[in-house]
Amino acid sequence: MFIISSKNMLQKAQHAGYAVPAFNIHNLETLQVVVETAAEMRSPLIVAGTPGTFSYAGMGNIVAIAGDLAREYNLPLAIHLDHHESLADIESKVMAGIRSVMIDGSHFPFEENVALVKSVVDFCHRYDTSVEAELGRLGGIEDDLVVDSKDALYTNPQQAREFVARTGIDSLAVAIGTAHGMYAAEPKLDFERLAEIRALVDIPLVLHGASGLPESDIRQAISLGVCKVNVATELKIAFSDALKEYFLQNPKANDPRHYMQPAKQAMKEVVRKVIHVCGCEGQL
């Protein structure tokens, strides 16, 4: 079986002190890049897609292509539902073969968040599907959802302990000062808060908003218990910038088999860098 749950993957990372990258993909080319690069580096891999990605590319297409690539490269991987908000949506995708989900109820009050997440956990665990949830809110833009910086909330360590105990989630996405999208100025991450959460919570922790973070910050977060690092915007920028440059240099280009190559190569360099920073090369 090549499409797997991320639970054991993250537990192994937690015990060994590295993190597994979760790369957001959008189409055939971006999916090819992350799978091929992870296979070359023998890195565990989580392929992430937002509701918008699954709507755009097609649920069946993503699962089929990812499964074919995983078999071709002998690379078990997790296809992960990133920032999904609907139990019904998650149920349908789990029944279609997904085994790793994130239910995002972070915009709800604490008790409503707990209730929603618990309902997802109760369903998903019947199908050996791992569940990630978020406590606190990241600022920035994710899948056309905008969270203003004033509405971003840091994760409360004591609440995190209660949240994990009451919901039974497999991993916890924490808010410690990161944001979705690229940073206008270098962010100041609250590593003291992260250490407090780690002391109270024994499941793998997840860092969203890693695009553009200094490598030293990512490494420090991993040393304090982060086992999954999400990267999306940095991949899109590398891909689209290379594509734009190709058309500037080749304005009459019309063959996607040619103009997609430099875009894929640029994205591949970002994927290689992230795998290296996460310390997961050779961890298969």
UniProtKB/Swiss-Prot annotation:
EC number per UniProt: 4.1.2.40
Gene3D superfamilies: Aldolase class I
Record-level Gene Ontology MF annotations: tagatose-bisphosphate aldolase activity; zinc ion binding
Cleavable signal peptide: none
Catalytic reaction equation(s): D-tagatofuranose 1,6-bisphosphate = D-glyceraldehyde 3-phosphate + dihydroxyacetone phosphate
Gene Ontology biological process: D-tagatose 6-phosphate catabolic process; galactitol catabolic process
Keywords carried by this UniProt record: Galactitol metabolism, Lyase, Metal-binding, Zinc
PROSITE patterns per record: ALDOLASE_CLASS_II_1, ALDOLASE_CLASS_II_2
Function of the protein: Catalytic subunit of the tagatose-1,6-bisphosphate aldolase GatYZ, which catalyzes the reversible aldol condensation of dihydroxyacetone phosphate (DHAP or glycerone-phosphate) with glyceraldehyde 3-phosphate (G3P) to produce tagatose 1,6-bisphosphate (TBP). Requires GatZ subunit for full activity and stability. Is involved in the catabolism of galactitol.
Subunit structure: Forms a complex with GatZ.
Similarity annotation: Belongs to the class II fructose-bisphosphate aldolase family. TagBP aldolase GatY subfamily.
Record's protein name: D-tagatose-1,6-bisphosphate aldolase subunit GatY
Organism: Salmonella typhimurium (strain LT2 / SGSC1412 / ATCC 700720)
Recorded name of the encoding gene: gatY
